[in-house]
Amino acid sequence: MVSNLLKVVLAIETSCDETAVAVVRSDKQVLSHKVLSQKEHVVYGGVVPEIASRAHINYLYDLTSQSIEESGCDLADIDAIAVTSGPGLIGGLIIGVMMAKAISSVTNKPIIEVNHLEAHTLLIRMFHDIDFPFLVLIISGGHCQFLIVHDVGCYQRLGSSLDDSLGEVFDKVARMLNLGYPGGPIIEQKSIMGDSKSFFLPRALINRFGCDFSFSGIKTAVRNIVVNQKYIDNDFICNISASFQDCIGDILVNRITNAIHMSQAINCKINKLVVTGGVAANHLLRNRISICVKDNNFEVLYPPTELCTDNGIMVGWAGIENLSKGYVSNLDFAPKARWPLESIKRSS
């Protein structure tokens, strides 16, 4: 086990379209936090992998230097380097891992490869006193899944999306309506002014056992409505956005209820649900989820809204959690575009 003395971790996150660096301390203090969201993708309505990789190359060195300087530390004060090694866009992952390995080699400090989903999952423990085990729902641009979190590095998947991720569907619906990228915040804003009963959208799998998701039918239904609509005015956009959000809310409530029952059948001590990932920043969905969880005698916890999307703080905290268990990596690890959370293998 690693000493209980305060540890300082430099964290690097480049798995998608955010270039992020942070310096985090084991007493839950954030010494610096830099995030650069790449605006280059807006005109394309989604992330273009090659553009993302080039942007990481352009921004990462300066962002790392700025983050270290802002933290008041120098490299000698850093105890370990944590870096997202997957899952994600392989080009961006390679750039972040190369930077982290270079710093580790030069400073002779340990390196910790961090699973991006584990970083989202464990971040809640930086802000709330939550013990293992607990249930987590990860809803983001690339992932949608329920897992039981038994411990750091020990995860059990209960269900996941059979097709699109939830964040991906938000982005695609926004693109159909010419609302821009990212789609989630814009659709949420438009839905506030709309009538959620204007259009009926299919609630896939809602009456089936389990907690898997399917969103492709909703996406197709929205596309058909948009194609057949003669006038795409603001009222229509607000109404379809509200109907879409209402549909997603119904699906989440049903799947969460099932996941709660499944998790308690596995371990009756589980009584908390953590909801994390970019879509967890959606306040309308948070309200639906919170009511559902309370009705099931569970407690729901969310990370701070500004940390639901990708950031270096979550990678740094995951690094600290792993470091406290004595989990470090050799320099020969490779970034992974696919890395299921339940497949993590740790060594001290």
Curated annotation (Swiss-Prot):
Location(s), subcellular: Cytoplasm
Keywords from the named record: Acyltransferase, Cytoplasm, Iron, Metal-binding, Transferase, tRNA processing
Annotated CDD domains: ASKHA_NBD_TsaD_bac
Cellular component annotations (GO), alphabetically ordered: cytoplasm
Top-level EC class as recorded in UniProt: transferase
Manner of cofactor binding, per the entry note: Binds 1 Fe(2+) ion per subunit.
InterPro entries, per database record: ATPase_NBD, Gcp-like_dom, KAE1/TsaD, TsaD
Family: Belongs to the KAE1 / TsaD family.
Protein name (Swiss-Prot/TrEMBL): tRNA N6-adenosine threonylcarbamoyltransferase
